[in-house]
Amino acid sequence: MTPLISIALLITGCSSSETENKSPSASSTPRPPSISVSVKPAPTQYNQGRQSINFDPCTNVSDTVVSQAGFDPSTRERDDEIHDTYSFIGCKFDHKEVVRGQNVPTRTLTISSTNITLDEFRKREGISATEIKVNGRDAITYNRPDAESCFIVMKTNDGSLDVQTSVSGPFTSEKPCDRIRDVAGLIEPTLGSA
């Protein structure tokens, strides 16, 4: 056998076994995230003049991500706002601690997918917004000290994702913005590409 024929047979043999070893389960459809608490479906959107929101944080952010962010996935609760011209499809999670003998929420995480764009948030927040990147994704951060809340808004295919951390001042010394960049960094990979 000539060396050229041997190489051709070797290449053919490799490529056919490569094809045979591909499993049918290796499809491009991602598995849904693991979520232990079911929530009602997202409400109907009206969105006159805007696209519908496809990313639902209540069904697309896994219990693992919520736990890694420091919140209790068993407190998963729908938190939506539907208006005629825009929508927020959201989910809320608590972190509870025993304070003075009572188990109370000391921190809350709210994740809202909206068809309001990042540019619209920039205009609305003006000079109080700071440009940042979350895992390379365009975003802004701002806070509302009077509401004990901090926000990161990231650009998405739907418009933007609003990540809000809030604290209950009487029950914790933590500030709302203390860990929000880490929290947003954990949530960002669930969005796919923007």
Residue locations for each model-derived region?
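N-terminal export and membrane-targeting signals
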Residues: 1-5
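C-terminal motif of bacterial Sec signal peptides marking the signal peptidase cleavage site
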Residues: 9-13
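Short, solvent-exposed recognition patches
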Residues: 68, 72-135
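Extracellular/mature segments of secreted proteins
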Residues: 64-70, 98-102, 158-159, 184-187
